[in-house]
């Protein structure tokens, strides 16, 4: 079984990205393959060098998901519109296009959007 998790919200403003990452990690721990696609303001979830002091560290959750086998792709045009480059992203997160998102959806049994 394979899930694609689409994250559209930035971290630290709302809890959607946090819920998405918890969902992805739980699926991985249950042996389900997971693709994560960061879209719109969700691209900020993969921005490296985040160090929040009083809330859960989303970046660490994303790194954990990658370590457990999640494939993470980040919308390139969304990054460009926000001044982010691939070198601004954590290791394991790759710039992508809508073609990549379509490929994720086609190969998945379920797609969940947060």
Swiss-Prot record:
Listed InterPro entries: DsrEFH-like, Sulphur_relay_DsrE/F-like
Superkingdom in the source lineage: Archaea
A GO CC annotation given for this chain: cytosol
Membership in a protein family: To M.kandleri MK0008.
This protein's name: Uncharacterized protein MJ0989
Organism: Methanocaldococcus jannaschii (strain ATCC 43067 / DSM 2661 / JAL-1 / JCM 10045 / NBRC 100440)
């Amino acid at each position: 079984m394979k899930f694609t998790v689409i994250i559209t919200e930035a971290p630290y403003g709302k809890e959607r990205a946090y819920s998405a990452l918890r969902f992805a990690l739980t699926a991985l721990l249950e042996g389900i393959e997971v693709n994560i696609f960061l879209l719109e303001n969700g691209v900020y979830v993969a921005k490296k060098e985040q160090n929040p002091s009083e809330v859960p560290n989303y970046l660490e959750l994303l790194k954990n998901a990658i370590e457990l086998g999640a494939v993470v792709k980040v919308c390139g045009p969304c990054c460009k519109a926000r001044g982010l480059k691939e070198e601004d992203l954590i290791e394991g997160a790759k710039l992508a296009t809508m073609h990549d998102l379509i490929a994720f959806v086609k190969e998945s049994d379920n797609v969940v959007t947060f």
